[in-house]
């Protein structure tokens, strides 16, 4: 079995075409440009004076001897037709009168009526069978001297043909047997002299043959047939039956008539006798004109048609309009009369029309679609045998002539059908369709058997035309001054024109040729042109050599870019090696010049942009200056140049990209130095420090915009695609180490410049913030904190609004971050130095709250996660405590102990079990102390003497309620108290934050102070019945683990202890210190 490697596969059509073109181009590249193909000789549509006179005579003769009524849309007046002929033939009035008189003196033609009896329907059935054997008698009666409407005339209208017309002038059709709808389709030529007194007569008869009665009885079908037998028995043997007649005055007929006429009776016996289909045409015999005597009728008609169409086309062109068909009623009338009088068949009329139009199309400008109708007519009626040898030759010549002319137009379609004219595509498409229809005709195939297939002829014409057009363009772009630079510019213009032509071929022309002829014009043109372009580009780059000047380098770069675009235009499905494959190697020596010029041009633009920059924002929404915009454009141009270059060789492409990145980063740092120097230069002449700050803001914004531009280099230079290309030729990570290292170094330098600028702006505000915070603290005590903070907030509002207006969002956010960090530092220092002043702490607390709102700015400033730093949270907590009163601090202390109680699960110190409920009706807090368990042995005997002290805390909320105690249990670590206590207390203080029942378990000591077993805190807000109006039921038991105070002290206690002048605070701290001391003496070994 043969495999796909056994034999080479057949090449696709596109590949075969490319191979053929390449072979031809090898010869073409070595030979001089081919000579232009000789132009097709077009026959003139003008007649000689003698031919024109004969044709004019023929036209006048046709009008003067017109017969019949005019057609509905035809011209009635002969004078109007004569005037039109005089204009169409451009005959002077005197000459016209002379020729008209001469034509009138010519012998009249023999007038004839061409009558065709087509068929009849619904005639009477005269035979016994119910049918008839009809035939017709017809002729023309000349009425001489009989006035219209006289009795004789009326009688003659009732007369039959055999009684009124001589037998030699009578014509008879064939007999159609046994039918009521006979079909004859027979034509007769009937001559007459005077149309005004002539009438056409047609009688229809039923042929009667002698038959026996027995035979007729055999055909009998009904009573009507029986009556027919009796009637025939009375008449003469062999007498025919009259079926009806048609009588028409010739002067009432049109030049051509085709209709159904009713059969009239001689008597009123049977008024409805059916209809007869007749066709009439008035024709001439023996016309006296020279043209009619010497030339075939269709030739004369063809020449007349050519003359009239030529006149109409010329008239339309003079009026600036396009001719589409014969629209003048005079021309239509004359041509109709001539074809009718000459008795031209439809086929010969179509042939004459084709000969005239195909010849005129080659010399006059009118739509080729006019040729489709005669082509269709000839194809529909084509029968080769009907044409004589000279007619076949004439038709074949017209085919070959139009084909040659059409191919010459197709070869030059770029100039003949320019796209600057809107209807050019439709005109070309119409021409192609005409050629296709013509070559598909049976007549063309029989008369032009040796003609090559039309697609082959058109393809060759397009190929030759493409080559001719290229050489024409090359001559057009030939420089006046010879030199390398001028030659490069000329070659660049040539390549751009070639690409423009290919774009037009692909966008417009290719669809037309492909739809009509299945020809891929674009591919053929591309394959032809790329060989021609490649030769000239290779010769030019060889002439340039290795020493490339800047101007020549720029010209070569533009040529390189154009060639890249040219190659991208090529068909994507072509696998053929093209002449332009690897063309980049021809430009390899120009790469250093291109890179150096790119950097030099960019550096000049950067320097010029900075020098022209006044460091003023471009607008309210645009906060950078002109140099930033110019720099962005400059870097975009560098990226565009890199994309245009797109060097195919991977390793060289990597080195080129490294150079582009290096130059871009260098330009960025150069810009930073230049823009800072420009700011110092402008600030030196400014006396207002605010203007210097404005310039600094603009500089920072410009550098930030530059940083964003540099950050997009990987995308703009397509690093990912480059990394895929160079993966096979570079070491792993080499691209990352080289390009990304360059980029990160540049970004780091720009980031440092931005931070330096923002830090400078922040330093100008930090002094003001510290000053206003100090004034806030030093304000009089009578000033509320909300009022004391106003100067600071107004200062920040003004300054931050200014910075927000002049800085881009990224830099403004950086500034806010620096200011927020500095502000927190100032507040922490102030809070630490005024720790003992609740007033100062209150003001600092209000300041922190307002500053948080200010720096957040409803989402337009710093986000919450940036504001709520560890320093902020610690400061917020400290100020919350420092600003609180002593009683508020005591409440916070008990709230923290309640929280500690809720989080404690270990019972290392023991636990107490209680029940608590509140009776709102009695305003009593009912407490049942049930038991304690697992107490620590604090006595030397290994046991304890426990009792529990019950107090409602904080004391300032329950000043009238004295502490309660349980009984003391001797030597018991698990005492059962089972004691009940009631506290008369309103519900309101019990519901406050920090309100609790403090259960202090003590070990009774007879000799000294009681020892602390532990504390338990029952929050009153959890007591059943306190929040509802319904009396509580059975209160649930609550088991509370015992806890110790914090061994390292409590910040709240330390804060209270610092308030020396507050006796309540000092008493509370003293008690809590005592409890902490007791706890430290008996803490378990595992307690930290």
UniProtKB/Swiss-Prot annotation:
Compartmental location: Cytoplasm; Membrane; Late endosome; Recycling endosome
Pfam families referenced in this protein's UniProt entry, alphabetically: C2 (PF00168), MUN (PF06292)
Binding sites annotated in the UniProt record for Ca(2+) 3: 938-939, 1003, 1005, 1011
Annotated spans, Interaction with RAB27A: 240-543
Record: residues binding Ca(2+) 1: 127, 133, 206, 208
Cofactor(s) the protein requires to work: Ca(2+)
GO CC, any one term: Weibel-Palade body
Domain of life: Eukaryota
Keywords, alphabetical: Calcium, Cytoplasm, Endosome, Exocytosis, Lysosome, Membrane, Metal-binding, Phosphoprotein, Repeat
GO biological-process terms attached to the record: defense response to virus; dense core granule priming; establishment of localization in cell; germinal center formation; granuloma formation; natural killer cell degranulation; phagocytosis; positive regulation of exocytosis
Annotated PANTHER family: PROTEIN UNC-13 HOMOLOG D, UNC-13-4A, ISOFORM B
Quaternary structure and partners: Interacts with RAB27A and DOC2A. Interacts with RhoG; the interaction increases RhoG affinity to the membrane lipids, targets Unc13d to membrane lipids and facilitates cytotoxic granule (CG) docking to the plasma membrane.
Similarity field: Belongs to the unc-13 family.
Protein name: Protein unc-13 homolog D
Species classification: Eukaryota, Metazoa, Chordata, Craniata, Vertebrata
């Amino acid at each position: 079995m043969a495999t796909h490697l056994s034999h080479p596969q057949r090449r696709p059509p596109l590949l075969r075409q490319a191979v053929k073109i390449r072979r031809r181009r090898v010869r073409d590249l070595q030979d001089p440009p081919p000579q232009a193909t000789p132009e097709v000789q077009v026959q003139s549509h003008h007649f000689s004076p003698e031919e024109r006179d004969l044709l004019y005579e023929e036209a006048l003769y046709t009008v003067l001897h017109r017969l019949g009524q005019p057609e509905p849309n035809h011209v009635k007046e002969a004078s109007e037709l004569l005037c039109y002929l005089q204009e169409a033939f451009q005959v002077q009035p005197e000459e016209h009168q002379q020729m008209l008189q001469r034509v009138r003196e010519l012998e009249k033609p023999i007038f004839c009526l061409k009558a065709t009896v087509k068929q009849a329907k619904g005639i009477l059935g005269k035979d016994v069978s119910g049918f008839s054997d009809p035939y017709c008698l017809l002729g023309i009666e000349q009425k001489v001297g009989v006035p219209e409407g006289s009795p004789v005339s009326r009688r003659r209208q009732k007369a039959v043909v055999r009684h009124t017309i001589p037998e030699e002038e009578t014509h008879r059709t064939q007999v159609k047997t046994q039918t009521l709808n006979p079909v004859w389709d027979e034509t007769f030529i009937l001559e007459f002299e005077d149309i005004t007194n002539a009438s056409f007569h047609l009688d229809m008869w039923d042929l009667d043959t002698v038959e026996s009665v027995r035979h007729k009885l055999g055909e009998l079908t009904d009573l009507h047939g029986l009556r027919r037998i009796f009637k025939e028995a009375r008449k003469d043997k062999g007498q025919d039956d009259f079926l009806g007649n048609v009588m028409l005055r010739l002067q009432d007929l049109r030049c051509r008539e085709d209709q159904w006429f009713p059969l009239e009776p001689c008597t009123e016996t049977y008024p409805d006798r059916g209809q007869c289909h007749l066709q009439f045409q008035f024709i001439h015999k023996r016309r006296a004109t020279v043209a009619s005597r010497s030339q075939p009728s269709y030739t004369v008609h063809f020449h007349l048609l050519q003359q009239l169409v030529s006149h109409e086309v010329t008239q339309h062109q003079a009026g600036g309009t396009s001719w589409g068909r014969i629209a003048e009623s005079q021309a239509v009338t004359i041509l109709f009369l001539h074809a009718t009088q000459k008795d031209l068949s439809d086929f010969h009329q179509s042939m004459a029309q084709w000969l005239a139009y195909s010849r005129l199309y080659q010399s006059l400008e009118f739509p080729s679609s006019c040729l489709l109708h005669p082509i269709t007519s000839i194809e529909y009626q084509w029968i080769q045998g009907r044409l004589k040898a000279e007619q076949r030759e004439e038709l074949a010549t017209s085919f070959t002539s139009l084909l040659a002319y059409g191919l010459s137009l197709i070869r030059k379609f770029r100039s003949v059908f320019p796209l600057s004219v809107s209807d050019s595509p439709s005109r070309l498409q119409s021409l192609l369709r005409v050629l296709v229809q013509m070559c598909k005709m049976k007549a063309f195939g029989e008369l032009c058997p040796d003609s090559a297939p039309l697609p082959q002829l058109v393809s060759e014409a397009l190929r030759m035309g493409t080559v001719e057009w290229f050489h024409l363009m090359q001559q057009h772009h030939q420089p006046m001054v010879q030199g390398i630079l001028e030659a490069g510019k000329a070659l660049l213009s040539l390549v751009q024109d070639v690409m423009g032509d290919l774009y037009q071929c692909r966008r417009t022309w290719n669809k037309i040729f492909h739809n009509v002829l299945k020809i891929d014009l674009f591919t053929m043109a591309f394959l032809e042109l790329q060989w021609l372009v490649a030769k000239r580009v290779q010769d030019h780059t060889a002439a340039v050599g290795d020493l490339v000047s800047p101007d020549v380098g720029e010209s070569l770069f533009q040529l390189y870019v154009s060639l890249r675009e040219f190659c991208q235009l090529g068909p994507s499905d072509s696998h053929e090696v093209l002449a332009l494959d690897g063309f980049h190697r021809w430009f390899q020596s120009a790469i250093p010049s291109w890179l150096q010029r790119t950097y030099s041009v960019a550096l000049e633009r950067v320097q010029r942009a900075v020098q022209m920059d006044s460091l003023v924002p471009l607008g309210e929404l645009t906060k950078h200056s002109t140099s930033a915009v110019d720099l962005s454009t400059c870097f975009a141009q560098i990226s565009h140049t890199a994309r245009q270059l797109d060097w195919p060789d991977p390793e060289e492409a990597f080195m080129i990209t490294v150079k582009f990145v290096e130059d871009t980063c260098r330009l960025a740092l150069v810009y930073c130095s230049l823009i800072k120097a420009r700011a110092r230069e402008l600030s030196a002449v400014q006396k207002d420090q605010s203007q210097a700050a404005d310039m600094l803001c603009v500089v920072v914004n410009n550098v930030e915009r530059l940083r964003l531009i540099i950050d997009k280099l990987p995308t703009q230079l397509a690093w990912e695609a480059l990394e895929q290309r160079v993966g096979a030729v570079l070491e792993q990570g080499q691209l990352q180490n080289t390009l990304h290292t360059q980029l990160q170094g540049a970004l780091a330098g720009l980031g440092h410049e931005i931070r330096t600028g923002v830090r400078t702006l922040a330093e100008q505000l930090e002094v003001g913030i510290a000053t206003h915070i100090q004034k806030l603290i030093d304000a009089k005590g009578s000033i509320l904190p909300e009022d004391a903070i106003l100067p600071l907030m107004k200062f920040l509002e003004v300054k931050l609004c200014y910075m927000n207006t002049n800085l881009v969002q990224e830099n403004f956010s950086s500034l806010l971050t620096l200011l927020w960090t500095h502000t927190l530092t100032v507040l922490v220092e102030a809070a630490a130095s005024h720790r003992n002043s609740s007033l100062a702490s209150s003001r600092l607390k209000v300041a922190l709250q307002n500053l948080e709102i200010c720096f957040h700015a409803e989402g337009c400033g710093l986000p919450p996660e940036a504001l709520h730093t560890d320093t902020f949270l610690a400061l917020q907590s400290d100020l919350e405590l420092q600003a609180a009163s002593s009683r508020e601090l005591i409440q916070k202390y008990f709230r923290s102990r309640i929280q500690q109680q809720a989080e404690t699960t270990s019972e290392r110190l023991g636990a107490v079990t209680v029940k608590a409920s509140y009776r709102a009706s009695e305003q009593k807090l009912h407490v049942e102390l049930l038991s304690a368990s697992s107490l620590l042995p604090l006595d030397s005997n290994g046991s304890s003497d426990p009792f529990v002290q019950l107090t409602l805390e904080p004391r300032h909320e329950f000043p009238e309620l004295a502490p309660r105690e349980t009984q003391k249990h001797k030597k018991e670590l698990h005492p059962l108290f089972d004691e009940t206590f009631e506290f008369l207390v309103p519900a309101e203080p019990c519901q406050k934050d920090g309100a609790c029942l403090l259960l202090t378990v003590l070990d009774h000591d007879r000799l000294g102070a009681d020892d602390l077993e532990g504390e338990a805190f029952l929050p009153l807000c959890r007591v059943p019945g306190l929040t509802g109006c319904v009396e509580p039921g059975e209160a649930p038991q609550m088991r509370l683990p015992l806890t110790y105070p914090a061994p390292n002290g409590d910040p709240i206690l330390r804060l209270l202890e610092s308030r020396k002048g507050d006796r309540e605070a000092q008493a509370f701290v003293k008690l809590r210190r005592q409890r902490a001391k007791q706890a430290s003496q008996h803490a378990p070994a595992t307690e930290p």
